[in-house]
C-alpha cells in the first residue's frame, strides 16, 4: 500500500513538473518570437525609410532593376537603446548621413537621445524608455548641477552657462532652480537683474535675508559695479594662489580655488542682458557703465574658471546684439528652451553643431549642449516645478545646505 501511494505521489509530482516546464518553454518561445518580430520590425522600418525616400541608385541590367549604390544603415539593440549607424563612404550619401535624426525618430517612433559623428559613420542613439523628468526637489539631492536624469555636470567642468528662451519658455524657472543648486554646493550668489523682476523679488530678497550679504543688483551702475567687484575678486584669488603654490598645486596639477578646503565658488547670474543694454544706453554715463561691464564680463568668461567663478547669462535670443561670438564660445553649457527652437538662426547662434533636426519645444523643454559631456545638442526636459511646491520652504532648504557646508569651517547663519 505504501509503495502504491509513493508511486502515485511521484507520478503526480512528475506531471506537475512537466506542466510547469512546458509553460516555461512556451513562454520562452513566445518571447523569442516577439523579440524576433520586433527586430524584424526595426529592419523593415529602416528599409522602408531608404526605399520611400529613394536613398539608393539602381540600373536596369538584363531587364531587371538592380541596386547599384545606397545609403548604408546598420543598427544594434542594447538593453536600453537602439543605435543606428549611418555609414560614410565618401559617396553622394556622405553628407546625408548626419541629417537623418528626424526621419529615424519617426521610423522608430522614438525620441533621438544623442548623435555622434566620426570620419566613418554617424551614430544615432534612441533610448527605448522615456527619461524620468526630475522635480525641483530632486535637484537638491545631487552633488552635480543637474538638468535631467541623465544630464548634468560638475561645477566648473565646464564653466559658464548660456540660457536662452522666449517668454513663457521656462527660462526664469530654470534660472531659479540653478541658483538653488549652486547654493547646495556652498556658492556665493550675485543676481544681476536689470528688469527688477521675479528673480529679484522672489529669490534675491530671500537670499539677502538668509545669507546676510547683498545679492540683488538692478540698475546699470549696480550691475557694472558687481561685475567690477567680481573681476577684483578673481584677481585677488589668483594672487593668493600664486603666493601659496604648496596649497594650490597637487600632484603636478594646479587646483582651482574651490578645490581647497575653506574656499567656495562665486556665481554671477545676469538675466535679460538686452534689458541691461537698453536701459544703460539711455545716458552717456550709462553707456560707459555698459562698456565697462561688458569688458569685465568678457574677462570673467575667459579667465575665471581657475578662480572658481562662474557666469550664467539668460537671454531671450543669443544674438550678437548683446553676446559677441567670441563670448559665446566661452560658455561651456548652452541651453535653448521653448518655441525658440523652431528658429534655426537661434539654434545656430546657440550651438556649435548645425546637423540637428531641431523640433519646436514647449515650456520647460529644449536642447542642451555641454562641452566634453554632450558634444551634440540633445533634447531635454528641465526640472519640473509643481504648483504644490512651497517656494519659501524650498529656498530655506537650499540656504540650509549653503550654511551646512560653510559651518564646517566655523561660519554661522
Regions found by a protein language model. Give the residues of each.
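Basic- and hydrophobic-enriched, low-structure N-terminal and domain-boundary segments
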Residues: 1-160
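Generic recognition of flexible, low-complexity loop/linker segments
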Residues: 253-258, 299-300
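Intrinsic-disorder detector for long, low-complexity, phosphorylation-rich regulatory segments
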Residues: 247-250
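Phosphate-binding and hydrolysis-coupling loops of NTP-dependent motor/remodeling domains
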Residues: 61-90, 103, 109-127, 337-413
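Short basic/glycine-enriched coil/helix segment immediately N-terminal to the Walker B
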Residues: 257-266
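A generic structural signal for short, non-catalytic loop/turn and secondary-structure boundary residues
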Residues: 156, 261, 330, 361, ...
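P-loop NTPase catalytic phosphate-binding loop
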Residues: 1-34, 81, 133-243, 266-267, ...
Amino acid at each position: 500500500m505504501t509503495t502504491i501511494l509513493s508511486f502515485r505521489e511521484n507520478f503526480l509530482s512528475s506531471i506537475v513538473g512537466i506542466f510547469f516546464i512546458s509553460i516555461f518553454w512556451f513562454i520562452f518561445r513566445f518571447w523569442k518570437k516577439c523579440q524576433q518580430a520586433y527586430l524584424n520590425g526595426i529592419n523593415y522600418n529602416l528599409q522602408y525609410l531608404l526605399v520611400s525616400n529613394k536613398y539608393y541608385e539602381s540600373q536596369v541590367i538584363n531587364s531587371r532593376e538592380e541596386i547599384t549604390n545606397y545609403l548604408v544603415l546598420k543598427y544594434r539593440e542594447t538593453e536600453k537603446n537602439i543605435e543606428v549607424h549611418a555609414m560614410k563612404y565618401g559617396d553622394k550619401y556622405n553628407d546625408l548621413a548626419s541629417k537623418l535624426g528626424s526621419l529615424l525618430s519617426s521610423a522608430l517612433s522614438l525620441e533621438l537621445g544623442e548623435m555622434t559623428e566620426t570620419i566613418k559613420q554617424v551614430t544615432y542613439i534612441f533610448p527605448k524608455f522615456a527619461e524620468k523628468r526630475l522635480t525641483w526637489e530632486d535637484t537638491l539631492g545631487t552633488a552635480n548641477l543637474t538638468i535631467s536624469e541623465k544630464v548634468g555636470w560638475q561645477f566648473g567642468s565646464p564653466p559658464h552657462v548660456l540660457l536662452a528662451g522666449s517668454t513663457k519658455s521656462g527660462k526664469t524657472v530654470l534660472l531659479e532652480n540653478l541658483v538653488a543648486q549652486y547654493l547646495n554646493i556652498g556658492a556665493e550668489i550675485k543676481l544681476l537683474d536689470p528688469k527688477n523682476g521675479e528673480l529679484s523679488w522672489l529669490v534675491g530678497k530671500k537670499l539677502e535675508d538668509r545669507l546676510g550679504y547683498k545679492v540683488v543688483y538692478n540698475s546699470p551702475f549696480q550691475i557694472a559695479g558687481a561685475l567690477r567687484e567680481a573681476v577684483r575678486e578673481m584677481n585677488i584669488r589668483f594672487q593668493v594662489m600664486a603666493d601659496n603654490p604648496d596649497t594650490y598645486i597637487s600632484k603636478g596639477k594646479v587646483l582651482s580655488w574651490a578645490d581647497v578646503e575653506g574656499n567656495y565658488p562665486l556665481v554671477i547670474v545676469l538675466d535679460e542682458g538686452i534689458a541691461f543694454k537698453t536701459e544703460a544706453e539711455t545716458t552717456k554715463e550709462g553707456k560707459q557703465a555698459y562698456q565697462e561691464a561688458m569688458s569685465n564680463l568678457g574677462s570673467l568668461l575667459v579667465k575665471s574658471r581657475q578662480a572658481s567663478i562662474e557666469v550664467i547669462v539668460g537671454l531671450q535670443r543669443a544674438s550678437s546684439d548683446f553676446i559677441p561670438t567670441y563670448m559665446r564660445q566661452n560658455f561651456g553649457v548652452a541651453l535653448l528652451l521653448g518655441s525658440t527652437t523652431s528658429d534655426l538662426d537661434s539654434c545656430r547662434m546657440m550651438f556649435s553643431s548645425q546637423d540637428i533636426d531641431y523640433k519646436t519645444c514647449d515650456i520647460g523643454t529644449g536642447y542642451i549642449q555641454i562641452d566634453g559631456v554632450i558634444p551634440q545638442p540633445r533634447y531635454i526636459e528641465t526640472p519640473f516645478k509643481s504648483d504644490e511646491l512651497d517656494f519659501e520652504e524650498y529656498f530655506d532648504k537650499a540656504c540650509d545646505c549653503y550654511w551646512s557646508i560653510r559651518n564646517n569651517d566655523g561660519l554661522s547663519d
